Amino acid sequence: MAQAPHIHRTRYAKCGDMDIAYQVLGDGPTDLLVLPGPFVPIDSIDDEPSLYRFHRRLASFSRVIRLDHRGVGLSSRLAAITTLGPKFWAQDAIAVMDAVGCEQATIFAPSFHAMNGLVLAADYPERVRSLIVVNGSARPLWAPDYPVGAQVRRADPFLTVALEPDAVERGFDVLSIVAPTVAGDDVFRAWWDLAGNRAGPPSIARAVSKVIAEADVRDVLGHIEAPTLILHRVGSTYIPVGHGRYLAEHIAGSRLVELPGTDTLYWVGDTGPMLDEIEEFITGVRGGADAERMLATIMFTDIVGSTQHAAALGDDRWRDLLDNHDTIVCHEIQRFGGREVNTAGDGFVATFTSPSAAIACADDIVDAVAALGIEVRIGIHAGEVEVRDASHGTDVAGVAVHIGARVCALAGPSEVLVSSTVRDIVAGSRHRFAERGEQELKGVPGRWRLCVLMRDDATRTR
């Protein structure tokens, strides 16, 4: 495998006269719209390992949609500050959802940009499946009826000196406040500075920070109907946990989970408990340490031209053909010691302990189903997977599974296509392969070398 830098294609959605930059990764059954972090544009996310891993975990169970809101990063700059703020940033999010064909999404709303998510859930209830607020607030500053907010005199340095390039030299280190566990990491600090520069010049940072500091969206909380998960680190001093408790008290049916930690930046520190809560909230299944991990060879099969076959045969004859296909494939999987873990449309997903067994099984399946007048495409990859139901082995998940599915999608009729990982493991065996070259796999970082099984020269096991 030739691994390239982690690059996701940036596209643009139109929001009035604004161009809103966005990226998509993963292809899970649920859309997860990740609102921007604090002055971290989307083209900087994958350059920071902890943030990259956090988003990859999200993409293992959802389709992640992330964006730069207007005024920041790759999105359009503004002529006037009057078009900044939670209401306008919510419009940016809707424009991106429309551009990617997302009718409804779970909204991931971190820190002070949580206010955008709160407005989005209240103003566009039909577009919000659920809401996740992380270290967020409905208002940053103190008010007589909001004592958990920061006093203006304490907030002022964050709106002035903190936004200047020489802030640390002038004695104000914002990173030590928002992410104390990585404040001493020179590599992280260099990335943080570069991300801030990419986000925009100090004038943009001052304008955005001023709008956020003056925002107050408490009036929308009573209108939020979507299921809401509120996650807040109890040791955060930048956005104290009192903000999260206020949200929980004022959003009907919401659930507050107080997590250990001092970092306001959601992707640093101990992220395991946070990610487990998010995955369980979205999927109903808690991943992480509660899921059994194992090394496996994953095989995907798919009937070529199934829609055309179904139209030509009619429902009854097509159903009979599918039954015969399923019987044949199940028999071959069992014969080679595999385990069926899921069905995928008109195909199967199976795991094997041996890559050679998976290849031999795939080889036989191609020939066996040909007697039915159909062809299949098969993709095989090997890697670590999560067993979702460890006691029964009923399903598997993880990046390796996504790779297997993508390899299968690139296979031609009656082809067995494998990743170079599989080819390298079985080097020296009777199986021979032809190079297919490096390919991009949708939702998977880097470029992957693929190989096709040379079936005509293979030694058959029958």
Curated annotation (Swiss-Prot):
Mn(2+) binds at residues 302-303, 306, 346. The lipolytic activity of the full-length protein is regulated/inhibited by the presence of the C-terminal adenylate cyclase domain. Lipolytic activity of the full-length protein decreases in the presence of ATP, but ATP does not affect activity of the N-terminal domain in the absence of the C-terminal cyclase domain. Lipolytic activity is inhibited by the serine modifier phenylmethylsulfonyl fluoride (PMSF). Optimum temperature is 40 degrees Celsius for lipolytic activity with pNP-decanoate as substrate. Optimum temperature is 45 degrees Celsius for adenylate cyclase activity. The lineage of its organism: Bacteria, Bacillati, Actinomycetota, Actinomycetes, Mycobacteriales. This is Bifunctional lipase/adenylate cyclase LipJ. It catalyses: a fatty acid ester + H2O = an aliphatic alcohol + a fatty acid + H(+); ATP = 3',5'-cyclic AMP + diphosphate; decanoate ester + H2O = decanoate + an aliphatic alcohol + H(+); an octanoate ester + H2O = an aliphatic alcohol + octanoate + H(+). May play a role in cell wall modulation. The N-terminal domain exhibits lipolytic activity. In vitro, hydrolyzes various p-nitrophenyl (pNP) esters. pNP-decanoate (C10) is the best substrate, followed by pNP-octonate (C8), pNP-laurate (C12) and pNP-butyrate (C4). Exhibits lower activity with pNP-acetate (C2), pNP-myristate (C14) and pNP-palmitate (C16). Can also use tributyrin. The C-terminal domain catalyzes the biosynthesis of cyclic AMP (cAMP) from ATP. It has a guanylyl cyclase side-activity, corresponding to 7% of the adenylate cyclase activity. It comes from Mycobacterium tuberculosis (strain ATCC 25618 / H37Rv). In the N-terminal section; belongs to the AB hydrolase superfamily. In the C-terminal section; belongs to the adenylyl cyclase class-4/guanylyl cyclase family. Changing residue 377 to A: Does not substantially affect adenylate cyclase activity. Expression in M.smegmatis leads to altered colony morphology, growth, cell surface properties and cell wall permeability. M.smegmatis shows enhanced biofilm formation and survival under lysozyme, acidic, nutritive and antibiotic stress conditions. It also enhances the infection capability and the intracellular survival of mycobacteria. Keywords: Hydrolase, Lipid metabolism, Lyase, Manganese, Metal-binding, Multifunctional enzyme.
